[in-house]
Amino acid sequence: MAMELVHVGFGSVIAVNRVVAFLSVDQQPIKRLIRESKENGLFIDVTHGRKAKTAILFDTGHIMVAAVTAETIAHRLDTASMLSEGKIGP
């Protein structure tokens, strides 16, 4: 089984098969999860100093924050899926 990687900004990629959810960082419960993940050493910041827009929850318990929106990541995921299925050309 091939691992599908999706670009989440600034040279960072994620393994799609490990993602549980894409979440908005504006909600209080998500802010709490981010704070707890920082305390437990499970936090990954790939914003490069920009405003965090999306929190990505992984099956390992890690939380990554990215400066791109969840919609942008979803569009990249759809495009990658269509490329791998041969529906569109490279």
Spell out what each predicted region is.
Residues 56-90:
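C-terminal structural segments of small proteins and small subunits
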Residues 45-59:
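Short, structured protein-protein interaction patches enriched in aromatics and acidic/basic residues
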Residues 31-40, 45:
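Compact, glycine-rich, soluble single-domain proteins
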Residues 4, 15, 52-54:
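A generic structural signal for short beta-strands and their flanking turns/coil linkers
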Residues 1-13:
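Short aromatic-glycine motifs in intrinsically disordered, low-complexity regions
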Residues 13, 25-30, 39, 61-63, ...:
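Short, charged/polar surface micro-motifs in flexible loops or helix N-caps
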Residues 16-24:
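Phosphoinositide-dependent membrane-docking surfaces
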